[in-house]
């Protein structure tokens, strides 16, 4: 994989001003983004998140998943910590793309869970890859990570790439009546590390 750094700009947000670093995968044409906040100290573990694109959750406020809640909470946590990063990867629908994700949602509306829907469409439960993150982290100067995730695959992928994951920080937010079954499937079938105690319930109406 060939990751090319393109440019950096300021990104004002409700939680403060982040820096937005653009990257291009010259093999696939996909465009990825790294957000950084504060002055990153490479000698210290940096709070961060690896976030896969979710148009429906991140931009359209969908309650079918917890993605948008996780992204906003991660940005808020980073701002409160004074430094941190988010890698925003263009891997919509756990890697199957937006239109296939809508097809999967259609199957879920008919009773399939998130894993069954992917498999009925001929995909694995999770098609994402993470090899692009190492050159992105190298560019922004991150060597050690306190990773905000519930997904053990992300921790494993980072360690296999030689990135030191010093701590896993649970990020369990956004549970509501529309995504309860989805979150249960992520826990029981995809191995996401979740506990009922940590859930923050929102938008119950």
UniProtKB/Swiss-Prot annotation:
Gene Ontology CC: cytosol
Gene that specifies this protein: ribA
SUPFAM superfamilies recorded: RibA-like
Listed CDD domains: GTP_cyclohydro2
Domain of life of the source: Bacteria
Keyword Zinc: yes
EC number(s) per entry: 3.5.4.25
Binding site for GTP: 49-53, 70, 92-94, 114, 149, 154
Note accompanying the cofactor annotation: Binds 1 zinc ion per subunit.
Record's protein name: GTP cyclohydrolase-2
A Pfam family per the record: GTP_cyclohydro2
Similarity comment: family membership: Belongs to the GTP cyclohydrolase II family.
Entry function: Catalyzes the conversion of GTP to 2,5-diamino-6-ribosylamino-4(3H)-pyrimidinone 5'-phosphate (DARP), formate and pyrophosphate.
Entry GO MF terms: GTP binding; GTP cyclohydrolase II activity; zinc ion binding
Active site: residue positions: 126, 128
One GO BP: riboflavin biosynthetic process
Catalytic activity: GTP + 4 H2O = 2,5-diamino-6-hydroxy-4-(5-phosphoribosylamino)-pyrimidine + formate + 2 phosphate + 3 H(+)
Keywords: GTP-binding, Hydrolase, Metal-binding, Nucleotide-binding, Riboflavin biosynthesis, Zinc
Entry cofactors: Zn(2+)
């Amino acid at each position: 994989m060939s990751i090319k750094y393109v440019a950096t700009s300021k990104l004002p947000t409700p939680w403060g001003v982040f820096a937005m670093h653009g990257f291009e995968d010259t093999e696939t044409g996909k465009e990825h983004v790294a957000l950084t906040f504060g002055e990153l100290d490479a000698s210290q573990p940096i709070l961060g998140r690896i976030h896969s694109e979710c148009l429906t959750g991140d931009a359209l406020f969908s309650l079918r998943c917890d993605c948008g809640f996780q992204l906003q909470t991660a940005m808020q946590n980073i701002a409160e910590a004074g430094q941190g990063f988010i890698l925003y990867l263009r891997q919509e629908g756990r890697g199957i793309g937006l239109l296939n994700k809508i097809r999967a949602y259609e199957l879920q509306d008919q009773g399939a869970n998130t894993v069954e829907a992917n498999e009925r469409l001929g995909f694995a439960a999770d098609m994402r890859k993470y090899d692009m993150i190492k050159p992105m982290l190298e560019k922004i100067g991150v060597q050690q990570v306190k990773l905000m995730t519930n997904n053990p695959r992300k921790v494993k992928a980072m360690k296999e790439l030689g990135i030191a994951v010093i701590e896993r920080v649970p990020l369990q937010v956004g549970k509501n009546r529309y995504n309860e079954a989805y979150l249960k499937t992520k826990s029981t079938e995809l191995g996401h590390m979740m506990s009922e105690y940590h859930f923050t319930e929102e938008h119950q109406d």
